[in-house]
A protein has these predicted regions:
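Acidic, metal-coordinating catalytic cores used for nucleic-acid/nucleotide bond scission
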Residues: 39
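Positively charged, small/polar-rich N-terminal and surface patches that mediate targeting and assembly
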Residues: 1-31, 36, 51-93
């Protein structure tokens, strides 16, 4: 991204993988999380974690598919011209 931010893709396999996700989001990067490798209870815990993270830092979460989330930090707008995004299920604005 032009302003020095990155788009970082994570494929977590357990809740233990939440820390680097949080660190990259906290640093202002856009984070794409593919939760398809997680067991349902682990996925639920991770979604709870990122929801709190995004709320605390004023960003947005977008559900791209049933298992893929985009975490957008403040100041980043996610657009989808094909209307595949089911919408922001947490919008701080």
């Amino acid at each position: 991204m032009a302003d020095g931010r990155s788009i970082v893709v994570f494929h977590p396999t357990s809740y233990r993988d939440s820390r680097p996700i949080g660190e990259r989001f906290r640093d202002g990067d856009v984070v794409l999380c593919d939760l398809s490798w997680l067991e349902p209870d682990e996925a639920h815990r991770l979604v709870d974690f990122v929801a709190g993270l995004v709320f605390g830092l004023g960003g947005n979460i977008y559900k791209v598919t049933a298992h893929v989330l985009v975490l957008a930090p403040p100041g980043v707008t996610v657009l989808d011209d094909a209307e595949h995004l089911t919408g922001s299920f947490y919008n701080q604005s």
